[in-house]
Amino acid sequence: MNRTIDRCPHCGASDLEVLVEIEKYCYLIRPTEFESIWRTVPMTVGLCHACGTSMQLLPPDRAALDEIYSKYYGSYPTFASDPEMDERHREFLAFLVAAGIPMSGHALEIGSYDGRFLARLQDAGMTVHGCDPNEAAAAEARRAFGVETTLDYFTPDTFPADSFDFVSARLVLEHVTEPDTFLGGLKKVVRTGGHVALEVPDCGIVMAEGAPFWMYEHPNYFTAASLLRAMRRHGFDGAVTSHKGILRAVCRNTGEASLPTDDVAVDIALAHEFRRKYRDYVARFDAVLADVRRQGLPMAVYGIGNYFTNLLSSTSLDHSEIVAIYDGNPKKWGLEIEGLGLPIQSPDTVNESGPGVVLLASASYPGMMERIAPYLDRGGKALLPLPTPVLYQRPADASA
């Protein structure tokens, strides 16, 4: 059972403030490749006044996370296409080289999954090892690339001290229920002078617009400044940049126990302004939904994922009002979400016999509009419920 925390999991302080409370937050798990099931939980998002980091104050417990990771995250293959994942890994390796990371020594990837990225590091000259609890993915890493994986969640005790020259943890830290302990583990296993590279969602750019930035399986929410603070508290120093909605921290283990951090006032002000904008945005969108209901227009959703769950959790939209669900990923077509009784369809279906209003719920907002252009040309309506998708089209730029 989830319990409310009374101390910050990042810095240990007790000066916590509630930002948002959601009575029923919806999220999906996938028992198999062909099933999707709703879960509904209360959610409280808060802010630490001591370190400026946002987090869930009622975080998921280990049982809930195990269910998510062993199913929705554990289904193999993933929804992402092989070419898409290969391009992500290629681009990230080029980023590391440009950042001055030596392609030599021993490397660890936490959350290594099927070993594709480690294979690239291996080809570049590193001796590699993975850490991931997913047995199917680890087996694929060994079969396809000869990459060995420690089947476990990373902790300070998973590997001996000073084992690695480089550690990568991409889109992992936001999932960790004890982030301070996790970063302490990185400090232990990375040799002095070695490097770590982390990726986490850039919640700062989303908060600035007043859009939801939370996911149930993400207990932690970082801005560029709060991520760098967390690294410096553990003796890492470097830079944080933003790339298409993702923060990238490349930091060196200085050997110091900790380093000074900057003032948290900017992040606290950002969080307070977010709360005001979020409440205003939800109120305005609920007014639009009320008008759609008055007109008797049937509503469909384009996009099935975190934007969809936040749409249902943050606004007055009820799942019973949805007449159709569309998604641009062919791997999802035909899947039926338990409780909705609606199969996921190709967005091309909209152009054939679209509903009254399509609610856009995906990061691919510009492409979605192009995909349903015939529907829009003949008078169909599309609404962007939350501003988040547009933000994630931004190019790379320095954030800290």
Model-flagged regions — what are they?
Residues 22-23, 29-31, 207-212, 337-338, ...:
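Short aromatic-enriched loop/helix-cap "lid" or pocket-rim segments at secondary-structure transitions
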Residues 2-162, 166, 170, 244-247, ...:
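Conserved N-terminal segment of class I S-adenosyl-L-methionine
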Residues 13, 125, 146-147, 193, ...:
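A generic structural signal for alpha->beta connector loops
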Residues 93-210, 221-236, 249-253, 309-310, ...:
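Conserved SAM-binding loop
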